[in-house]
């Protein structure tokens, strides 16, 4: 879906709309640790999370860990993966390292990072549409392929919840998802289109 409707009353540059279109379709591609079918299933779970009875009840609780139950899932993804998706989409401010480590123990560190990054990328694009009163995009078609499950070199324990690149010249926000570079690229593209514009971030005057 190209952002044609808001362009009639709000000036949106081509880099922004083109980035949304490109990134959205690539979310449906086979990832490093999840297949295209699994990634699109995860995207369906992101939207389902907002009408999930368990998520709604947890949001009203003093602590989400006080509420037990099953998510209203719409996929056959692993239970822990669904929990990651729903909680990250609806209540990210109350996630804990202890909880994250349990999920990682179940699905693996790299799959955790890829899935979390996918949720964040989709959340930005969906929220952008909601803020402009636009219908949400149709989920992309799952693309074929098999995950290569290759862990990149140069990553390790830097004191975060997950392994990251040990290159200290990068800001934490720039290396948060570096354990899965291909999916991290999608996040970087969104950040640059919406906010930093890459090298232009250092310029004191932005011509937007």
What kind of region is each of these model predictions?
Residues 1-208:
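Hydrophobic alpha-helical segments
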